[in-house]
Structures are given as C-alpha cells and as structure tokens.
C-alpha cells in the first residue's frame, strides 16, 4: 500500500472515532472520509478488524514516539526518571478522546490490548510490591 494512502486511511479512522465513536468505523465511512473506494480499502485491509488493529497500532506508535521525543530517546536508553517524566507528560498532553476510546475498546481484546500494554510496559513506572519493605 502506498504510504500516503495508508496514512490517509488511518487518519480517517481516527477522525471517525474522535467524531462518532468506534462503532462508526465501517468500510463505507472510511471510504467516504478518504475518498478511496470501498474495494480499495478491502484490498489492503481485508476486514473491519484489520482496520481497527491498524488504527490501534498507529495510535500506540504515536504515543510512544511522543514519549521518545520528550525523553530524548527510546525507553531502554534513558534514565528511569526521564522515562517516568516522559510518560507523565505525554499522558497529560496526548490524552485525546480518540486515544481514550481506543484504549477502553482494547480492554477486552487481547490482540489490541497487547499493543497498548507493550508501550506501557516500556514506559510506565513499575508499581511497587506491597510486600516490599522499601
């Protein structure tokens, strides 16, 4: 798929979710939003689930890229304090309605949840164990 069409499709999905909610994402809605044909969408995304998965991946990647920009590097290359600060700052700056809706939607779907959880595992501060005396 041409990168510009892929980006156009992902941006359309995000706009639809932001405006109308996740249930409004259909091939017809995405085709109308992008100006692409329904057949063109089906060629690259064989199911609605594939569209949704790609949108989740795109948003999770954007979130991680934002944290990398704030921290000045990837999670495994920066100090824990920089990682924590980037996580907190990005949560405050980047929590749009679409991210919140997509994260909530992923809660019962292991394939979707793992995309967001991977980012969280790399960036979020570890939760102290209640049994830890420190």
State where each predicted segment sits:
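Helix-turn-helix
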Residues: 8, 16-50, 54
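N-terminal intrinsically disordered/low-complexity leader segments
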Residues: 1-4
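Hydrophobic alpha-helical connector segments
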Residues: 61, 65-100
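Generic structural signal for hydrophobic core residues of well-folded globular domains
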Residues: 55, 91, 106-107
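Short amphipathic alpha-helical elements of helix-turn-helix/winged-helix folds
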Residues: 12-16, 90
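Amphipathic alpha-helical packing segments from all-alpha helical-bundle domains
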Residues: 64, 104-133
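Alpha-helical DNA-contacting segments of helix-turn-helix folds
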Residues: 52-59, 66
């Amino acid at each position: 798929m041409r990168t510009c069409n892929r980006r156009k499709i992902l941006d359309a999905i995000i706009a639809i979710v932001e405006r109308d909610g996740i249930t409004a994402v259909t091939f017809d809605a995405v085709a109308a939003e992008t100006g692409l044909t329904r057949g063109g969408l089906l060629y690259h995304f064989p199911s609605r689930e594939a569209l949704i998965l790609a949108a989740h991946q795109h948003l999770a990647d954007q979130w991680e890229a934002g944290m990398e920009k704030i921290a000045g590097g990837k999670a495994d290359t920066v100090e824990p304090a920089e990682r924590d600060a980037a996580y907190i700052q990005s949560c405050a700056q980047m929590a749009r309605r679409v991210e919140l809706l997509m994260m909530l939607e992923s809660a019962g779907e292991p394939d979707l949840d793992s995309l967001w959880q991977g980012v969280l595992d790399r960036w979020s501060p570890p939760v102290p164990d209640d049994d830890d005396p420190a």
